[in-house]
Amino acid sequence: DTLAAPIVSSGRAARIIMKTYKKHYDVYPDMFIIEGSMAGGHLGFGADDITQGKTQSNDEILSDVLAVIEESGADIPVFVAGGVFDGKDMAHYVNEGAAGVQIATRFIATNECDASDTFKQAVVNAKREDIRIIKSPVGMPARAINSPLLERLDAGETFTARKCNGCLTACKKDDS
């Protein structure tokens, strides 16, 4: 069996997912991952809401999701992701009712991560002012480190893929 672990960014999303799973499969998700607005990568919030600080905090989302689960009578563990920085953060969320946390960005600089050493160093050296919200190629807001590539995209330059490696869908690529 495969565990179902949907990522949610609100109690409303958790409620909808629980209702849908129950209606169609007569089960609830095995766990929820709360991904707050401080997460790296793709974000489940509007870009304006993120940049204007109009998103719920991880604490607020956790409280809402736990309330939805409690209302249903289900026993679904919840893990918090996005902006979890250290052991103090981990302990805080567990004390607030989370089963645990999920951390990703902190592990980019490890030997086990297959990212390039240049990218790893950029992550290690990044300061708060180096991070920005962009519109990703799939159209979602995403957190990224400012770079010459982003500056070129801001200037209107476009790029075409030269080679695909395990793409999930077809993309425009340069066959030259």
How should each PLM-predicted stretch be described?
Residues 1-48:
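Conserved alpha/beta-domain cores
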Residues 37-79, 85-176:
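Conserved active-site-proximal phosphate/metal-binding subdomains
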